[in-house]
């Protein structure tokens, strides 16, 4: 009997040791350098030929700010709440519809699961359509086509985590801002190059040491690309790194994990979502 008990204890101890080893081996793949590189404002881009819609959207933004609805939606995505899926109707010219252009690869602002859209912007879009008494139609497309589609009359409004930027005003009229954003770096978890950085100046000092032999990733058409390549409107000088654009920030981070690029620059909220998902 003593031998049996001893054997059981040995097996139990081995099991606990194995579990401990598995836990110790579960390391993160990537991390965010939690220092804001930019100071941006998000807004929606309205068809220039619809000034009445612009006024209505601005009134709507003021209302959801004052009644707490905007904060309520943001808390769902930034504080572990339960997101609400949004369904798009089929576009029909005979119906009174609000047609929204977006890029559903920008969690937590817009993303798609199955046939439903989720994200801060998508839940706002549903509220806006209800506020206007219209049926909601969502058109999902590449990010760099979003504002263009509105200017071509293919959509009424762009809702896609859009930073207010001068060259985009050629295509749309921006609403009042509804969210403050910034760019951040995503690097591999074992990357120590930025560990001593405390300020944006510290990060930029490190970035300035990189040459063309260093590859950086970003989502095409976003502020991250402008930050890396340089942009006169923003006052970005850019860096000497080789910039590689992707259709989604998650694709850039995955390519970094695969060893093809060195780091990624992307908006703070999507960066943190991507890192959380990549690390499981």
Language model features with spans:
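Sec-dependent N-terminal signal peptides of Gram-positive bacterial secreted proteins and lipoproteins
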Residues: 4-25
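A ligand-binding cleft/hinge motif common to bilobed small-molecule-binding domains
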Residues: 25-38, 145-148, 160-171, 227-234, ...
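Periplasmic-binding protein-like
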Residues: 28-54, 104, 179-187, 268, ...
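Acidic, polar ligand-binding/catalytic clefts
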Residues: 29-38, 126, 135-205
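Ligand-binding clefts/hinges and TM-proximal coupling segments of bilobed small-molecule sensing domains
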Residues: 32-38, 58-95, 201-243
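Extracytoplasmic small-molecule ligand-binding "clamshell" domains
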Residues: 42, 52-80, 92-162, 170, ...
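Bilobed "Venus flytrap"/periplasmic-binding protein-like clamshell domains
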Residues: 104-107, 117-130, 180-250, 268-272
């Amino acid at each position: 009997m003593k031998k049996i008990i001893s054997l059981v204890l040995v097996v139990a101890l081995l099991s606990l040791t194995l579990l401990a080893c598995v836990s110790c081996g579960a390391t993160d793949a990537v991390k965010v350098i939690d220092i804001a590189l930019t100071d941006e404002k998000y807004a929606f881009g309205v068809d220039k030929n619809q000034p009445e819609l612009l006024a209505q959207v601005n009134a709507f933004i003021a209302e959801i700010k004052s009644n707490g609805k905007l904060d309520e939606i943001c808390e769902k995505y930034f504080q572990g709440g339960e997101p609400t899926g949004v369904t798009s109707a089929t576009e029909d010219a005979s119906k009174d519809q609000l047609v929204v252009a977006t890029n559903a690869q920008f969690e937590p602002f817009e993303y798609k699961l199955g046939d439903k859209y989720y994200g801060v912007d998508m839940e706002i879009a549903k509220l806006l359509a209800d506020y206007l008494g219209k049926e909601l139609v969502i058109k999902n497309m590449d990010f760099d086509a979003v504002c263009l589609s509105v200017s071509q009359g293919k959509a009424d409004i762009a809702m896609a985590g859009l930073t207010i930027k001068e060259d985009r005003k050629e295509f749309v009229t921006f609403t009042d801002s509804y969210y403050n954003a910034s760019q951040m770096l995503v690097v591999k978890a074992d990357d120590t190059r930025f560990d001593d950085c405390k300020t944006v100046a510290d990060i930029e000092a490190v970035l300035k040491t990189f040459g063309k032999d260093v590859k950086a990733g970003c989502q095409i058409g976003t502020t991250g690309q402008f930050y890396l390549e340089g942009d006169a409107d923003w006052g970005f000088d850019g860096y000497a790194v080789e910039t590689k654009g992707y259709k989604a920030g998650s694709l850039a981070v995955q390519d970094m994990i695969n060893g093809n690029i060195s780091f990624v620059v992307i908006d703070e909220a999507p960066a943190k979502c991507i890192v959380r998902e990549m690390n499981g």
